[in-house]
C-alpha cells in the first residue's frame, strides 16, 4: 500500500483540500510558514507571490502554484511530485 503524503494547502483552496483528502492525503492548512514544515508538498494560490515565505527553502518538498490550474490538474501535480 502506498503511503500518502502530507500536503500543505493554502487556506482559500478548500476544493483542493477536499480533493486531496478524498485521495487519502494528510492535508495541513497553511496559515504561516511554520505550517509548511514537515510537508512533502505545498499548494499555494500564487496570488500573493511568496507572502508566507513558502516559495523559499522553508520546506523540503515542492511548491505547486494553483493559479490557472483546475483542481484535477493540481491533484495530478501533487501525485507526480510526492
Swiss-Prot record:
InterPro entries: UPF0180. Signal peptide: none annotated. Disulfide bonds: none annotated. Belongs to the UPF0180 family. HAMAP family: UPF0180 (MF_00506). NCBIfam families: PRK03094.1. This is UPF0180 protein BC_1394. It comes from Bacillus cereus (strain ATCC 14579 / DSM 31 / CCUG 7414 / JCM 2152 / NBRC 15305 / NCIMB 9373 / NCTC 2599 / NRRL B-3711).
Amino acid at each position: 500500500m502506498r503511503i500518502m503524503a502530507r500536503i500543505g494547502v493554502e487556506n482559500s483552496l478548500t476544493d483542493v483540500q477536499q480533493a486531496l483528502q478524498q485521495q487519502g492525503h494528510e492535508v495541513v492548512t497553511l496559515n504561516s510558514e511554520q505550517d509548511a514544515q514537515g510537508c512533502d508538498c505545498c499548494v499555494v494560490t500564487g496570488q500573493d507571490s511568496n507572502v508566507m515565505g513558502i516559495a523559499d527553502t522553508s520546506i523540503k518538498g515542492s511548491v505547486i502554484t494553483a493559479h490557472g490550474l483546475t483542481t484535477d490538474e493540481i491533484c495530478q501535480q501533487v501525485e507526480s511530485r510526492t
